[in-house]
Amino acid sequence: MKKKEMLILTGPTAVGKTKLSIELAKAVGGEIISADSVQVYQKMDIGSAKILPGEMDGVRHHLIDVLSPDEKFDVFRFSQMVKEAMQGIYERGHIPVLVGGTGFYIQAVLYDIAFSEEETDSALRRQLEEEAAQKGNAYMHEKLAAIDPEAAAAIHENNSKRVIRAIEYYMQTGEKISVHNAREHEKESPYAFCYFVLNDDRKKLYDRIDARVDQMVEEGLYEEVKGLLADGIPRSATSMQALGYKEMADHICGDCPLEEAIYLIKRDTRHFAKRQLTWFRRERDVTWVDRTAFAGQEDEMLAFMLGKVDEMRNLNT
């Protein structure tokens, strides 16, 4: 039976996915679904490097600017929203092109992993949240690393919700959440898909990250975060744990000087890019698109990707 088609374009932060994703979507008659856990929020434009309407070049985009910064956003809600978007895309006779660097979210959609909305009144959950409030994110991340090193390597310590969830899962079941996720990952995808991972020379990538952070600061990251705080968005909100926002909020609230905040954003973003690449290397059925192999020529990269799409379609009969 012929499967519905889906394309994925992902890769580490600042690798340059946006322009290529537009060209890919135009070439296949696609609509883009953002797999970015920050661009989904309104008023969080600079720190998320959000695509501007004028850059979309007529390609319809989904899951951008749809939530208030004080709203909860997790893989459960993401999966729901993506399924709704995909239904409309298929009805219009188009192909969904999932674009972004949140590998866990991509995996959930690609393999149709079932998530249920987690209970929020669990006594154990509250106990772990209180422990995190008292001892800090770094302590909880070390606690997870002692239980499940693989999960700790995949989850940033700032993502306290996922760290706590992983510890909670182990304490409730006796099983590492990384083992659970690996088992779920063995499922066959219900889609005919191409899963492209864009990469570049590490030094070039890190230099691009540093330059992007400098540009964000120049464009008004400080003012953007200050505005969010003035709007009453708590520093504990899911949105405010994002890279760039947490560090700048710490500075605004007097916890560190500006120079240190900028240094931490650059350092932690580089670490995040490294973890993203580690995640994608563990994924199966991916096609790596290395900028160095194409000397940075995006037309050649696009032609290579379209060739893979043709191969996928020939097999999907």
Residue ranges and their predicted role:
Residues M1-T317:
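Phosphate/pyrophosphate-binding catalytic cores of soluble transferases and nucleic-acid-acting enzymes
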